[in-house]
Amino acid sequence: MPWLQVRLAITPEQAETFEDALLEVGAVSVTFMDAEDQPIFEPDLGTTPLWSHTHLLALFEADTDETALIAHLQLLCGGTLPEHHVERIEDQDWERSWMDNFQPMRFGQRLWIVPSWHAAPEPDAVNLLLDPGLAFGTGTHPTTALCLEWLDGQNLDGCRVLDFGCGSGILAIAALLLGAPQAVGTDIDPQALEASRDNANRNGIDPARFPVYLPADLPQQPAEVVVANILAGPLVSLAPQITALVQEGGRLALSGILAEQAEEVRAAYAGAFDLDPTAIKDGWVRISGVKR
């Protein structure tokens, strides 16, 4: 059935007031959306982060009286509404619409990330089957893409790979499919470890080839290749630990870094690594190098 959709342009300070008001006047769903494609990083503990410019979308039953709705919202919110737009939208197959947003993606020369509902575009290529899920990492974000492209360009034969902050396991699984005999994953989120196991199983990876650990349980065995796609702050603060996990002569790739954060991260690793030129994609960077 069709719906009445109300879109409000709000600030984070207005979010709770308008969310409560929309629910009080009968909204069946309320959604916050980024109005300007702004990333959110490392929010303070106990906070719910919102973008500085946020769209609040609310859906109402199709027979809702639009004029009365807006008047009631104005009354509840104490006067003038912020910039807003009201439209009627047709119902659709929301699951199919969501699935259509995720298409097979190629990284480098050999590697494809393929959702399970799609046929592989190149059956003879290296195809990693992965669906969007609760853990971070599907290949759509520039930082994941930078790491996947880097892995595709490496000779991983005989290498043990460590995925530091493994999320969905996408980087470790890609490394295994690209020729690494073993990969290890670690993440602070137990749900991420479960997602990594599930995704490895979907790709036919023997669990013995891809053990995953919480950080406290991670064996302190240096690896030939380490990838860490997390955030700039942790990459800097954890530089001694990450450096120790790369064996001498081993290779390191770091991402989750904005371009303006690159120099700080490079400085944290320059003492132990011969660093490559910084790779940039859509305002994000990858820093890689070889341990001396």
Swiss-Prot record:
One of its GO terms (biological process) is methylation. CDD domains: AdoMet_MTases. It catalyses: L-lysyl-[protein] + 3 S-adenosyl-L-methionine = N(6),N(6),N(6)-trimethyl-L-lysyl-[protein] + 3 S-adenosyl-L-homocysteine + 3 H(+). One of its GO terms (molecular function) is protein-lysine N-methyltransferase activity. Methylates ribosomal protein L11. NCBIfam families: prmA. Belongs to the methyltransferase superfamily. PrmA family. This is Ribosomal protein L11 methyltransferase. The lineage of its organism: Bacteria, Pseudomonadati, Pseudomonadota, Gammaproteobacteria, Pseudomonadales.
